[in-house]
Each structure stands twice: as C-alpha cells, then as structure tokens.
C-alpha cells in the first residue's frame, strides 16, 4: 500500500480556523459568541505582517459566511453561532489591518451583504444580533477605507450600494402593523442598527470619493434619515437638535466614536442589539440617530453636494405631499445651520428656484410650505454668508408679479411679502437695505402702463418696502439690546427741544386730526446701528412719485411706508434751541444736503391745475426701464389730466389723502425741523395762495366731479394745522394765534379726518384700503374773498423772520430770512433744488491734475461730451455744447410762473407740445455767433466727418416764429431724441436743440425753459 500524502492547511487558513471554538463548544460560547482571543491575536498579527495573505483570508471567510448564513436562516444554531464569530473576526481584521483594507474589501462587503439576509427561523423577522455584528463590521470598513474603489470596481460598487439599500429598508421598517401586539422596542432597535450603518456610510470617505456616485449614494441614505426625522414629534426634533449642538457624538448607541482624522488614529464604533435588563430605545433615540447622521453628512458637503442634498429633500417632500409645514420649516432651518457657513446660502436659493419652477395655479401645500421654509431660514438666527440678497429679491419679486397676474387676491401674496420682508432680518453688508429698497423701486418703475394689474403690483411691492423696514428695525433693536446698547427713551420735555404741542396754550379743538400725535415722542436719533447704514434719502427719493398715483390704495399704502421711513430711517436734523445754553443738538446750522439725483421732465402747466395737486392730484403711469441707462431710473412725478374726466372720485385727493399728507408734514417738522421749515414754509404759502386762485368751481364748467371746493377747504385746513404745529415747535406765538384764528373761521367739523392707526402687530399685506369721498359742496359759486389766502401771508412772514429761534437755527438775520422764505415756490423749482444736476454748468469739479489728465484721455477718444470733464479744450467735433453756448441756452433756472405739471417719460406724452420760451427770455452769448457755429456743423457734415456724440443739423428753415428746424444727435443710440426743447437762433431762424447731456449717465437731462 502506498502512503497517503500529507496535505497541511495553508498558514492563513489554519490561523483563521483556529479562532473558532470546537464544534461541540459553539452553542456554549454565547451569549457573547466571541472568537478565541489568543488565536485571534495570532491571526491579526499574521495578517498585519503579511498583507499579501489578506486576500486569501477574505476569500476563506467569505466561503464560510455564505454557508453559515444559509444554514442559520434554516434554524441551525451552531451555524448561527459560527456566523456571529466570523463577523467578529472580520471586524477585528478590519480594525487591525486598516492600512491594507483595500486588499480584502470585495470579500468584506460580500460577507456583510450575505449576513444582512439572515432571518429568524420560522418567524421571518430580521435577526438583530447578526445584523448588528454585520453593521459593526460595515462601520469599521467605512471608517478606514479611502473610498477609492467605489465607482471604479464595478463589483465592489454594486455590493456596496446593495448594502446601503438593505440598511435603508431596515431603517424604515414598521413592525406596528405586523402583529396584534406591536413591538415598538424591536422596531426602534432595528432602525437604530440600520441608521448606524447609514451613519457609517454618511461619514465615510467613500461617499465623497466619486463625484459621479455621490448622487446615487445620497439617494439611498437621505430618504431613510428623513423618514425617521419626520416621524418624530416637533418637540422631540427641537430637543434632539439642541442636544446635537452641545454633543458631537453621533448617537448614545454609537460608542467609541472619535472625530475623523488620519486613518491610523480613527476608531470604529461598536454596536449591540440589546443588553439584558436594559430598557429598550425610544422613538426619541431613533430621531436623534437620524438627525445626527444627517448632521454629520451635511457638515462635510461642498456647495454642489449640498445642492444635491436639498434636491433630495425636495423630492422626498414631493413624495409625501408637503403635508407637515411646521416640520418642513424646522428641517429646512436645521439643514441650513448644519451646512458649512460658506455654503448655507444654497438652501434658500434652491427653494426659491423650486418656487419659480412651479406653475401659476391655485396655491398648493408645496407653494405654501416651500415659501414658509424660505421665510423661516431668513428669519432664523443662522447667518447666511454669501447670500445673494438682490438675486433672491429679484426672483421673489418676479414671483409676486406672476401671482398677481394669475389672481389679484392670490392667497400666496401675504406669504411672499413676508418672505421679502425677511431679507431685512440679517445684514450682510452695510448698504443691504438701501439695495433692497432701490431694487424694489426699480421693479416698480419697470411696470408698463398697459399692465391691468399695475396698481396692485405697485401696492404689493410698496408693502414689501414697508415690511423690510419693519423687520430691519425689529432686528436692529434686538441686536442692540443683546449688546446692552438699549436706545434711550426720550422724555417729553428735554431742555432745548421744541415745545410739545399745545403746551401752555389752549387745547386744540376736539375735531383736530392730531388727536393721537404719531411723532410726539420719537427716539432722539434714528438708527445708529453698527450693522448697517440707514436708508439713504437719495434712494427713497426715487419712490416719492407714488404719492401721486391715480389709485387710492397705492397712495395710502405708500403714505404709510413714507411715514415709517421718516420714523425709523430718516436721520434727525438739528433741533431748534431757544437759547445757546440749552441742550439739544450740537450743531445749530442746518445745511441743506444737495445730493446727486436723476432729473424729471417738466412741461407746461396743465390748465386748471395747481401746485397743490402734488398732494391732491392723481398719478399717471411709470415708464418701463431703459437698459441704456447706467443709473437707476426715477419714478417720474405724474398727474393725470383728470380735472374734467374722472373714472373714480379717488382719482383726486380724498379726505384720507389729506390726513396722510398732514401726518407726513408733521413728521418732517419733527424729524428735520430746520430743513422742513426752510423748504416747507414757502410751499405752505404758495399752496394757500394758489388754492384760492386755481381751485374755483364756476357754474357749468363741468368740474363738479373734481371736488374742487372741497379740496380747497381741505388744503386750507391742512395749511392752518401745519402752521400751528410750526408755531408750537418753534415757539412763535404770533403764528400760533394766526393759525388758530384761521381754523376758527372754518366751519366745523373738519374735512380732514384723523389718520387711521396702523395695525398692531403689523400686517405685511392686507386688503386695499377703501377711499372715502368728500361730502358734495352744495354751492355753485364762491365769493371773491375766497380767492384770497386764508392766512395773512405778510403777517406770517414777518413773525417767522423775526423769530430768534429761527434766526439762531439758520444763523441768518431778518433780511436774509426774508429773502429765503419770500421766494416764489413751484413744484419744479422744489424738485430742482432737491438734487444736483450732473449737467449743471455751475456744478463743476475743482481743478485737479488727475481730473485734467482724465479729461485729456477722454477727449483723445473723440468723446464730444466735453461738458462731462474739466480741462483745456482739445481739437474735437463741434457739438451741442458750442451751439448751446452760442444760443445762451445754458439756463438752469426753472420757470416759476404758475405750477407746471410733471410729465411722464411715456410715449403718450411725446405728442404733447413741449414748453416754449420767448426770444427775450434767452441769454445771448455775446462772444459766440450762432451762424458761425451752424456753418462749422455743416462743414463737418459735408466732409463726411461723423461725430459720435455731436449734433448734426438735418435742415434749417427760414421761417416765421411758429416754424422750427428739427435736429438730431449723431449718436446711434438716439440719446436725447425725446424731450427736445426749443431754443432761439439767429434772426429768422428757430432751432430745436437737445437738452443738456447728463454725461455721467449718458442721457439727456431735461432743463425747463425760463419764462
């Protein structure tokens, strides 16, 4: 007989087999079911020193587990015990051989995948002990792997995704409906083990190793986390989220956890299914595990990955119907807070994009929940560094306009206004609120006049402006209080402050509209917040024409916004002081601020209209935005010619319009008393004077519907009340007596009602306010005395200029004040005085070498706009400047005859006649000759020289005074083609020239002709 050859096992297989107890001792190895410690140490030592043998060990272990898993599900307890020991061996190998984990990664994942399929014999449920050990091995693998094989090795990647899918299914398992006695603890244990496995994948390098496979992984990880999160009560969510902020541990059931570091220093957490005698996990533990896993994943994301996670959140909510608005908002807020600081802006931005993609239809839960989520994020304490405030605002405003076009009373509009208002909660740069208001003003200016929803759009956007100021003011106060810089409360009687109304005087009549003074005890200063700059008056000035809109709801909404601006944003001016020793402002001189702005087009007066109708007239349309302008377009001051044709009684000023105007004027005299007196006193005198001359109704003139007599009386009430306030605040007894006498001469009750008290707490968007009409005047004519001013203007002026307080505030003597207050006032002159014109010949920069160098550079570029720079003239094309010099047309005064109206830039006004001026009204330049200038222009044209910004005369007619020669610019963009004004040429010629160019803006600025 031959000898049987000796077949010894390979060393790695022998070391592996030695780790198992003898077959007869397997059942007694419980409940720990651990491998033999000494032999396990030999195996790990062998594998560590011979990494090349790890692949063979993995293959052998894979064969054993495949057999053990199948037998364990069939009820063989020995194989189940052997399976548990095999999984413990695998975890030990993963932990000790972490540097060479890639050598047996494929076998490792197959072992884990097979183990997750083990079921309890005859019950069919998940074997938690086996799954727990498999999850522990998987967590060890995800902890130490670099993830380079995921996405490269197709077999490994497929197995890895299958494991994630199985964990995801276990994390959402429900055992409550599977039996008569639901086992909540068993369900919670199952979910916790599965969530532990998902947490391992979420914190692993493998999830971020492949850009292509990242979306596939989060498709398997995010939904189970969200399911468990949304199943929790809102109180549990808040409590567990607060715990996350204090404790970085992934879960109370995940032990031995350490923050991610170098592979050699990492530690993989261990798991257990249940310890005898220990109370089972609660639903709060499951919620905590889900939130911590989500927190761990989000903390490591970049902007692209965060955006993809938000998309999965939206997809999850789409699947579940957006039914839990409160939880939706909470999750959105927490997700934003957990994303790295520099990427947080992606959450509100992406949610707004989702809203923009929705169809315009009746609001659905998705509309309301998504919008509430954005608002919650913007109002939360979480900072959104990098948020594109203007871009987000543009999207929200576009959505508002779309919804209004869909339905004027759309249920989504209040939420949209609140969302826009929330942009004022956090300040990310100093001029943020200025930019928001400016953008809203721009969008209002873009609304075409043909838009049927124009008035409602303007009203809603105006509510957005008010909402932004309300939210910003509240946030400022909160920030100041947290810093301990509480704003001191002003006292009613501060030394040097204006005397409170009616102090030491007879009480006002009960019918006065000043029953509840709005600005009686304002804060001594406006915002001095360290967070931001207050809204600039130059920015707010762009919105002022909304006071003249034809729709009452727009006027009333804007009036409230203007009052709010004066209360919270307007910088307080110097306070008048009766004696130099008294308190108050340190500066006694009120210097008017002349800021650069955009000019308005002025035309000749509308017949029968007066300057008083800047308050009582109705507004017209706002022109569309012109992209050729580099500066923001102003809303033009407009008035409809509604004195004979009224579509509604509120097309002219109503009693509540006068109440709003009274409040605004009262606020101005409280906030900026010196400036308000200087600009307001001439206006009050002119309004009182012109009301008697212009607002006259004669029998048969067809103006019964314009409420002429009622408006005249309301104007006189307003003027008298404002003068009385001025007298109270400046301590001028003579004016107070005169105003009270005038009020006593008017029949009671007053036509101006008390101004409605604003809602408290503030409502961001309410229904449009309903106008109230005057009571029709029964008289068909008036006596000649009513055409005179109600107040004696000479007496008023005399008392005003003799006031020592006024003289001290202006630092002017009586004669200077007389010249200041006695000037002729008009709307156009007031507008001109409120801003600097870029093209004004009197407003040129001082000589500067840098400026002259820039001048030479610009002139060398054949830029004919010499008026824009200062310096020596260079050789250039004859242009409009030379012709204007020759014509003496550089006139910067505005006609003060009558009260010219402010026309729109709209094309409907282009057909109207432009203002004409007589030959005698022009200043002729003695040093220039119009004919010579025209010859030079024609000479350039004949030579074929093209002046890009010069003027080219097409034809000149010798004609009568009624004929004119048309001119056009040589600019291809057609700058200055509209709004041309007529100048006077040489004898027998009349030339129509462009208005002066506003060269900083690259467009013409309309200069009204002087009469």
From Swiss-Prot:
Protein name: Protein EFR3
Bias type Polar residues, positions: 576-592, 609-625, 910-922
Region span, Disordered: 478-510, 571-636, 892-927, 949-1011
Alphabetical list of Pfam families matching this protein: EFR3 (PF21072)
Biased composition (Pro residues): 489-501
Family listed: Belongs to the EFR3 family.
A biological-process GO annotation: protein localization to plasma membrane
Gene giving rise to this polypeptide: EFR3
């Amino acid at each position: 007989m031959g000898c049987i050859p000796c077949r010894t096992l390979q060393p790695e297989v022998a070391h592996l087999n030695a780790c198992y107890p003898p077959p007869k001792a397997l059942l007694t190895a419980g409940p720990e079911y651990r491998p033999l410690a000494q032999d396990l140490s030999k195996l790990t030592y062998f594998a560590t020193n011979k990494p090349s043998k790890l692949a063979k060990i993995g293959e052998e272990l894979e064969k054993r587990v495949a057999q053990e898993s199948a037998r364990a599900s069939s009820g063989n307890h020995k194989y189940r015990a052997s399976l548990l020991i095999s999984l413990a061996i695998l975890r030990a190998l993963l932990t000790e051989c972490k540097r060479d984990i890639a050598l047996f990664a494929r076998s490792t994942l197959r072992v884990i995948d097979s183990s997750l399929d083990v079921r309890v014999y005859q019950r069919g449920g998940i074997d938690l002990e086996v799954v727990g050990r498999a999850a522990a091995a998987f967590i060890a693998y995800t902890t130490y792997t670099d993830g380079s094989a995921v996405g490269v090795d197709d077999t490994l990647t497929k197995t890895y995704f299958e494991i994630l899918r199985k964990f995801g299914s276990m994390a959402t398992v429900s055992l409550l409906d599977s039996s008569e006695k639901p086992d909540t603890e068993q369900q919670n244990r199952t979910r916790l083990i599965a969530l532990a496995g998902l947490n391992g994948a979420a914190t692993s390098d493998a999830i971020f190793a492949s850009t292509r496979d990242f979306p596939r992984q989060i498709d398997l990880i995010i939904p189970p986390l969200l399911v468990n999160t949304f199943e929790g009560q809102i109180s549990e969510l808040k409590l567990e989220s607060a715990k996350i902020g204090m404790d970085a541990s992934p879960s109370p059931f995940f032990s031995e956890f350490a923050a991610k570091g170098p592979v050699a220093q990492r530690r993989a957490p261990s798991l257990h299914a249940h310890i005898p005698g220990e109370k089972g996990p609660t639903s709060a533990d499951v919620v905590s595990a889900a939130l911590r896993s989500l927190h761990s994943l989000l903390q490591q994301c970049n902007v692209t990955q965060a955006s993809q996670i938000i998309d999965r959140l939206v997809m999850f909510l789409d699947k579940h119907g957006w039914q839990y608005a409160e939880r939706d908002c909470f999750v959105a807020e927490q997700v934003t807070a957990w994303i790295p600081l520099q990427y947080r802006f992606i959450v509100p931005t992406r949610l707004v994009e989702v809203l923009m993609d929705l169809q315009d239809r009746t609001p659905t839960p998705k509309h309301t929940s998504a919008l509430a989520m954005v608002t919650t994020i913007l109002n939360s304490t979480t900072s959104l560094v990098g948020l594109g405030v203007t871009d987000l605002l543009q999207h929200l405003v576009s959505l508002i306009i779309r919804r209004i076009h869909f339905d004027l009373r759309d249920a989504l509009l209040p939420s949209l206004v609140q969302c826009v208002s929330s942009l004022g909660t956090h300040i990310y740069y100093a001029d943020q609120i200025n930019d928001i208001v400016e953008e809203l003003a721009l969008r209002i200016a873009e609304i075409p006049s043909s838009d049927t929803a124009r008035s409602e759009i303007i009203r809603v956007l105006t509510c957005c402006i008010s909402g932004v100021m309300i939210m910003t003011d509240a946030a400022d106060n909160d920030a100041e209080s947290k810093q301990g810089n509480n704003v001191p409360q002003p006292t009613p009687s501060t030394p040097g402050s204006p005397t409170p109304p009616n102090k030491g005087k007879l009480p006002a009549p009960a019918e006065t509209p000043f029953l509840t003074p709005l600005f009686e005890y304002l804060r001594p200063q406006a915002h001095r917040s360290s967070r931001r700059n207050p809204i600039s008056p130059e920015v707010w000035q762009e919105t002022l024409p909304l006071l003249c809109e034809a729709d009452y709801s727009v006027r009333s909404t804007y009036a409230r916004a203007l009052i709010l601006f004066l209360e919270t944003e307007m910088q307080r001016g110097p306070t008048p002081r009766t004696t130099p020793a008294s308190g108050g402002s340190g500066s006694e001189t009120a210097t008017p601020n002349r800021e650069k702005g955009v000019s308005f087009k002025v035309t000749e007066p509308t017949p029968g209209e007066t300057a008083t109708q800047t308050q009582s007239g109705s507004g017209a349309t706002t022109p569309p935005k012109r992209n050729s302008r580099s500066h923001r377009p102003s809303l033009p001051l407009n008035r409809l010619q509604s004195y004979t044709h009224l579509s509604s009684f509120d097309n002219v000023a109503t009693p509540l319009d006068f109440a709003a105007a009274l409040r605004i004027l009262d606020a101005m005299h409280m906030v900026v008393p010196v400036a308000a007196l200087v600009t307001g006193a001439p206006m009050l005198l002119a309004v009182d004077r012109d009301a008697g001359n212009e607002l006259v109704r004669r029998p048969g003139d067809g103006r019964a519907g314009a409420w002429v007599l009622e408006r005249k009386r309301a104007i006189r009430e307003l003027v008298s009340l404002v003068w009385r306030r001025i007298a109270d605040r400046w301590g001028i007894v003579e004016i107070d007596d005169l105003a009270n006498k005038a009020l006593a001469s008017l029949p009671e009750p007053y036509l101006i009602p008390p101004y409605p008290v604003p809602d408290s707490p503030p409502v961001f968007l309410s229904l449009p306010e309903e106008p109230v009409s005057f009571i029709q005047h029964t008289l068909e004519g008036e006596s000649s005395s009513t055409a005179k001013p109600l107040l004696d203007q000479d007496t008023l002026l005399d008392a005003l200029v003799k006031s020592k307080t006024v003289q001290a505030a202006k630092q002017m003597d009586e004669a200077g004040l007389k010249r200041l207050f006695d000037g002729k006032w008009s709307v156009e002159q007031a507008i001109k005085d409120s801003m600097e014109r870029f093209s004004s010949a009197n407003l040129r920069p001082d000589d500067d070498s840098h400026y002259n160098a820039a001048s030479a550079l610009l002139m060398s570029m054949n830029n004919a706009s010499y008026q824009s720079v200062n310096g020596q003239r260079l050789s250039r094309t004859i242009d409009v400047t030379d012709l204007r010099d020759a014509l003496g047309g550089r006139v910067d005064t505005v006609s003060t005859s009558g009260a010219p109206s402010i026309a729109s830039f709209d094309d409907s006004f282009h057909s109207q006649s432009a203002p004409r001026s007589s030959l005698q009204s022009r200043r002729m330049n003695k040093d220039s000759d119009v004919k010579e200038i025209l010859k030079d222009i024609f000479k350039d044209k004949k030579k074929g020289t093209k002046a890009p910004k010069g003027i080219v005369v097409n034809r000149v007619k010798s004609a009568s005074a009624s004929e004119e020669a048309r001119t056009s610019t040589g600019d291809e963009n057609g700058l200055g083609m509209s709004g041309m004004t007529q100048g006077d040429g040489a004898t027998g010629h009349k030339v129509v020239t462009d208005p002066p160019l506003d060269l900083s803006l690259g467009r013409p600025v309309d200069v009204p002709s002087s009469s």
